[in-house]
A protein has these predicted regions:
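Sequence-structural signature of mature extracellular/luminal beta-sheet repeat domains
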Residues: 1-311
């Protein structure tokens, strides 16, 4: 197992997606805190800025035409042409109210976009406040091909990563605050029903994705924190009080590099935990994951770099 860190020219390379056609085939895209969208060559030797969203790009996907679908925490759902750099705002509101924390997406074979809005109360700058207060205002949303946006699931504990099963018979959304991945059935006898793909995860899931191997890959951004768990279950007054103390005194995510993969039955297939001895740069807080042809690409909300694990 070889772990390689590839620097990019800005902080917070939060998610990754692998290009599949033309000049983008095999290249890895990521978005950074300064609004940049970067293309990284497959071997990591070249990094080019291809666009600027004017916001804070988080989750990345590819649409049916090979354009990037970008969840921008500030601007909502965007489409980006990687050849021209053109940025199109697709959706920024739900039921007449602006989104404040568009986070991650998955694109279906018919062009439907499933995506998450982590909170209706706090934006990305105050994600820790939402997490500790356990507001449960996260939502799974659906953008239909006619441009309409619908709420599919609400009252989620920090809705995060989104992925479709290989047969598209269900859609998943990571519930970071509950350490679960929620599954919503789309076809068959269970259509419309909701259950859990996996639960009691060893830490807090962030982005998820379906790999080229058909598995649902799940990031573990930080290990389970007993203090955070207690705070989330405590009185609302206490939870609010904690978010008002100086940031240096608040609970901090523990450093780790860990991703898991589950099959459609919710069986754990891979649990990849990179030891410190293989991570001399201290890369941490993996928030994006993409398995492609046996390589596992990663992004991080905190790092000015992406990483790849050759297994």
């Amino acid at each position: 197992m070889t772990f390689t860190v590839i620097p990019v020219p800005a902080d917070g390379a939060e998610d990754v997606v692998v290009g599949t056609s033309g000049r983008d085939e095999g290249a890895v895209f990521t978005g950074t805190a300064d609004g940049g969208i970067f293309r990284v060559s497959h071997d990591g030797s070249h990094v080019d800025r291809v666009a600027h969203t004017g916001g804070r790009p988080l989750g990345l996907e590819l649409d049916l035409d090979g354009r990037l679908v970008v969840c921008d925490a500030h601007r909502g759902l965007l489409r980006v042409d990687t050849a021209s750099g053109a940025v199109e705002q697709v959706a920024d509101s739900v039921r007449g109210t602006r989104m404040v924390f568009c986070n991650n997406a998955a694109v279906a074979s018919d062009g439907t976009v499933w995506f998450s809005d982590s909170s209706t109360k706090y934006g990305i700058e105050r994600w820790k406040d939402d997490f500790v207060q356990n507001t449960r205002t996260g939502r799974l949303l659906r953008l239909d091909t006619d441009g309409s946006v619908h709420v599919v699931i609400d009252e989620l504990a920090f809705a995060n990563g989104v992925a479709l099963s290989q047969d598209e018979d269900f859609v998943c959304v990571a519930e970071s605050g509950a350490r679960t991945v929620v599954r919503r059935w789309l076809t068959g006898d269970r259509a419309g029903m909701r259950d859990l793909l996996c639960q009691d995860l060893p830490g807090y899931p962030d982005n998820i994705s379906r790999g080229s191997d058909g598995l649902i890959w799940v990031t573990i951004a930080s290990p389970k924190d007993p203090l955070v768990e207690r705070l989330q279950q405590g009185p609302l007054t206490l939870r609010r009080a904690v978010t008002k103390i100086p940031a240096r005194l608040q609970p901090k995510p523990q450093a780790t590099v860990r991703v898991q993969a589950y099959d459609d039955r919710g069986t754990l297939v891979h649990d990849l935990d990179v030891p410190a001895s293989d991570n001399p740069d201290g890369y941490h807080m993996v928030t994006g994951v993409r398995e492609h042809d046996g390589r596992v690409w990663m992004g991080s909300l905190e790092e000015p770099a992406i990483a790849v694990l050759d297994v």
